Curated annotation (Swiss-Prot):
It is found in: Plastid, Chloroplast. Usually encoded in the trnK tRNA gene intron. Probably assists in splicing its own and other chloroplast group II introns. InterPro entries: Domain_X, Maturase_MatK, Maturase_MatK_N. HAMAP family: MatK. One of its GO terms (biological process) is mRNA processing. Belongs to the intron maturase 2 family. MatK subfamily. The lineage of its organism: Eukaryota, Viridiplantae, Streptophyta, Embryophyta, Tracheophyta. The gene is matK. GO terms for cellular component: chloroplast. Pfam families: Intron_maturas2, MatK_N. It comes from the Eukaryota. One of its GO terms (molecular function) is RNA binding. It comes from Robinia pseudoacacia. Keywords: Chloroplast, mRNA processing, Plastid, RNA-binding, tRNA processing. This is Maturase K.
């Protein structure tokens, strides 16, 4: 956000109306590609000097206007491979510039709205990510029904452009945006829409994330409007940003986080009748009342998608399930409400009778199969969960190899410490421990049995067997038995997001 304000040097009132000239600014593409703004990325690729970069951008857009949009036949496709390759480069460059330019008015609108509402000075509408699971523990035990709805996508390109025009009043810019989207769609017209979205998200991730999250924000704004019209009760809305672990840092960098990536934002609201959570392309509705209210909101969603966004959604694809019988995936867990039944014998005078009590408890399950798939993708095991060596790490020292495996193992244990059943984590520890041993044996060109026999299996990797309560006793040597007993039950650690970074960084 600060970089945009420094390099644009435009008045805030004019930035919303004149975006088209920004497409021809070189520093826009420097911001998009992360290059040094004093160097020309076009000069590096094409061979021109810095003064020619503006002409190259104009030339790219001119070629898009003059390009023939007819489908190339199969015989001509081999002859025009160089032209199609250049067109992919042009669309890639311009899409990166679009992603930066189109984020500017929305980030400025967000910052101005926050300043007017003085949200940054209050703690009511901004909560830490660590309050999500206590919220589920307190609220979901009193709820009965849940609907896990997949937000339909992709949306038609023309509808998406028309929605954007409500926010940005720049006709030339949207002519160019429409031309670019249809140009990219026509160049990939031989594949299905789902595969087109997949290729577009991989080749233009920043632009795709913006378009998708803008569509989600538009859909949720209408959904909030319908909710406010249907109920006179006050709505409490919260937003959680995953990029910042500490609460004060998130308050400080609120505008910057939203301007960069909307996809990592989780939004939810609650009222006495219905709870709504949107996470990873899904809308989760939960209610305590009978399914009548859930059915009403289900048809609200269907008519909203069909009438406003021209997206076909059938009522049979949206299911309303009991929380006690259905679990849903959220933040790496499987969550449902478990019913604990107990029978109490009561006696009054000479009459004795039995009382059946039902206690609801939030059951948080470790998804063992998705975890094994993630470990298999990171080459710690095969698809069946059998540990394998990681030859990529064989060049490191023994201490670094053990430290990497221990970091992943401990962070997984920390993250899933709040789960109800921790026995499934023993298999994950076994996979990581044996994968570490096989990696060390591969490095020393020995078998696993000979390597353990030479170094001693008891002293090697003994850190894998240190339980969480032992770690607490090491950190707090004077901890009482009450603290250790609480630790055995359920504790949500403050570093619950670190393990995913380790898995990604050490692949």
């Amino acid at each position: 956000m600060e970089e945009h304000q420094v390099y644009l040097e435009l008045d805030r009132s004019r930035q919303q109306d004149f975006l088209y000239p920004l497409v021809f600014r070189e520093y826009i593409y420097g911001l998009a590609y992360g290059h040094d703004l004093n160097r020309s990325i076009f000069a590096e690729n094409v061979g021109y000097d810095n003064k020619s970069s503006l002409l190259i951008v104009k030339r790219l857009i001119t070629r898009m206007y003059q390009q023939n949009h007819l489908i190339i036949s199969a015989n001509d496709s081999k002859k025009n491979t160089f032209l199609r390759y250049n067109n992919n480069i042009y669309s890639q460059i311009i899409s990166e510039g679009f992603a930066v330019v189109v984020e500017i008015p929305f980030s400025l609108q967000l910052s101005s709205s926050l300043e007017e509402a003085e949200i940054l000075k209050s703690y009511n509408n901004l909560q830490s990510i660590h309050s999500i699971f206590p919220f589920f523990e307190d609220k979901f035990t009193y709820l009965n029904y849940l609907s896990d709805i997949r937000i339909p996508y992709p949306i038609h390109l023309e509808i998406l452009v028309q929605i954007l025009r409500y926010w940005v009043k720049d006709v030339p810019f949207f002519h160019l945006l429409r031309l670019f989207l249809y140009d990219y769609c026509n160049s990939n017209s031989l594949i299905t829409p789902k595969k087109w979205i997949s290729t577009f998200s991989k080749s233009n991730p920043r632009f795709f994330f913006f378009l998708y999250n803008f569509y989600v924000c538009e859909y949720e704004s209408i959904f909030y409007f319908l909710r406010n019209k249907s109920s006179h009760l006050r709505l409490k809305s919260f937003s959680v940003f995953f990029e910042r672990i500490f609460f004060y840092a998130k308050r400080k960098h609120l505008v910057e986080v939203v301007a960069k990536d909307f996809l990592s934002t989780l939004t939810f609201f609650k009222d006495p009748f219905i709870h709504y959570v949107r996470y990873q392309g899904k809308s989760i509705l939960a209610s305590k009342n009978a399914p009548l209210l859930m059915n009403k909101w289900k048809y609200y969603f269907i008519h909203l998608w069909q009438c406003h966004f021209d997206l076909w959604a059938q009522p049979g694809t949206i299911h309303i399930n009991l929380l006690s019988e259905h679990s849903f995936h959220f933040l790496g867990y499987f969550l449902n409400v478990r019913l604990n039944r107990s029978v109490v014998r009561s006696q009054m005078l000479q009459n004795a009778f039995l009382i059946e009590m039902v206690i609801k408890k939030l059951d948080i399950i470790v998804p063992i199969i998705p975890l094994i798939r993630s470990l298999a993708k990171a080459n710690f095991c095969n698809g069946l969960g059998n540990p394998i060596s990681k030859p990529v790490w064989a060049d490191s020292s023994d201490f670094d190899i053990i430290d990497r495996f221990l970091r992943i193992c401990r962070n997984l244990s920390h993250y899933y410490n709040g789960s109800s059943k921790k026995k499934s984590l023993y298999r994950i520890k076994y996979i990581l421990r044996l994968s570490c041993i096989k990696t060390l044996a591969c490095k020393h060109k020995s078998t696993v049995r000979a390597f353990l026999k030479r170094l001693g299996s008891e002293k090697l990797l003994e850190e894998f067997f240190i339980e969480e309560q032992e770690i607490v006793s090491l950190i707090f040597p004077r901890a009482s038995x009450t603290l250790q007993r609480l630790h055995r039950n359920r504790i949500w650690y403050l570093d619950i997001l670190f393990f995913s970074n380790d898995l990604v960084n050490h692949e």
